[in-house]
Design a protein with these regions (language model features):
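Positively charged, phosphate-engaging catalytic surfaces used for nucleic-acid and nucleotide handling
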Residues: 2-152
């Protein structure tokens, strides 16, 4: 009934074009959101084992593990991934409210996951904080180069 006027036809055509555009964009956006969620869950799944490894390593040395020790590990990795900033600093700089990981890009989350997984292994091998920090910085650069080469 709306189509009986010229304005009605224009409105209908507008909505048809909107639906066509949505059908073109929706699969791409859905795929991107799915990949971001996978990266976020992966990063989350490696954090707990890293913390557990840290606690075991410190216990074997006869040391207690305080909350600041976990924070130090997270800050070390975040500084590598987030250009020298802790997650808190990065969130403030980018105006992020809530959990900074929820606002990180897929690449940042994958990078963080890689570093958490590698850090867990280095902790289990008995490597100290300064040595792990240096090793992770070097491995991070290699990982980034490999990622860039793979995209070309």
């Amino acid at each position: 009934m709306v189509e009986r006027t010229e304005q009605g036809r224009l409105i209908r055509q507008y909505f048809i074009k909107c639906e066509e555009a949505l059908h073109k964009v929706a699969p791409t956006v859905t795929k991107q959101l799915r990949n971001e969620l996978k990266a976020r869950l992966k990063a989350q799944s490696y954090h707990k084992p890293m913390c557990a490894a840290l606690e075991v390593a410190r216990m074997e040395q006869g040391k207690t593990t305080l909350p600041r020790h976990y924070t130090n590990e997270s800050n070390m990795l975040n500084r590598i991934v987030l250009a020298g900033m802790t997650a808190k600093q990065w969130a403030q700089h980018h105006g992020v409210m809530g959990n900074p990981r929820d606002a990180m890009s897929e690449l940042q989350l994958e990078h963080l996951s890689y570093l958490e997984q590698t850090n867990t292994t280095l902790i289990e091998l008995g490597m100290g904080y300064p040595a792990r920090k240096d090793k992770l910085a070097g491995l991070s650069q290699k990982w980034l180069v490999q990622r860039m080469e793979a995209k070309q």
